[in-house]
Amino acid sequence: VHEAASSNARFGGFNAAQGELLLAEPLAEQLSDADALMSDGIGKQKDRGVGLAVAYEKPSLGLKGDLGSTPLGFRETSLVGGISLDRPFAENSNFRYNLNLSRRAVVDSLLSFAGAKDARTGVEWGGVTASGLRGQISFDNQRYGTYLYAGWASLDGKNVESNERVELGSGIYWYLFSNEDARLTGGLSLSAQHYDDNQSFYTYGHGGYFSPQSFFSLGVPFSWAQRGANWSYQVQSSVGVQYIDQDGAPYYRDKGAQSALESLAATYAANATDGRVLNTRYAAQSKTGIGYSLGASGEVRLGDGFFLGGALGMDNARDYRQYTGGLYLRYLFDDAGGAMPLPVNPYRSPYSN
């Protein structure tokens, strides 16, 4: 029962709270549709699929590229990919630059990643992608380092209102301990984000992804990395303070659906006798809290060019708590001998945050 109520409150048409209000004091003809909607479930909100992607890397040029699709089998699928260039400003320089152009899936929720359907009404929406560019400059002299980055993206999905994102961040870190096979760093990081529109919700027309109008985060990150002859691992953590400010938003992003809901709310208000109202908007909110993250990754050389690796992570670095994990097996066609990388460079899915 709890799961059904939670789902009805998050997805699709009239939610459970609205329906209870309407049906508690029914207005006959105008509420017949609401009655029908509330009598049925929204359908299962889960999905599965198989992602496909190919990638190319030329380390001597600092060039990387990939092309693929969001998982086939999802309700909504899209082409995704990107290209990046990471090089020093001059040979043997401590200064570097990174340029990245990409189209990526927004994986904050099932709605934003795979899309959703309300079985009561038949409406489908979601499957959001972010297309944009990002640039970074950095300095590292093996005693300390600093970086500055900026990015812009346009976000779109099926029957989802378009949005734009701007981000800016910087940080500094120090090598607290460093030798050939181990390294400890600590520092400070500051990041900021702005979205034109609050698309954080799950009703029809919303994207279901974190999209505050103001987001600021100040963190204290630490990282420990170590390697042996055939293994390498890294543990990372960060704790700090974050501030989130989100505008209020209409219950539906579709103008026709929102207009119909507002008309129904006005009719209810004119006839209700208990003083209750039918909400048609999500409330604005601002909050400050503690942000944290913890992650670990590692890789083992099995021999004959094969490597086994994995990664785990948890964080509340936005407005939700997230747990991630992955395991991979990769094969290198080139010579796989020599020292293991420090820090480890685990495989990253094109769909990872």
Language model segments and positions:
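Gram-negative and organellar
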Residues: 1-353
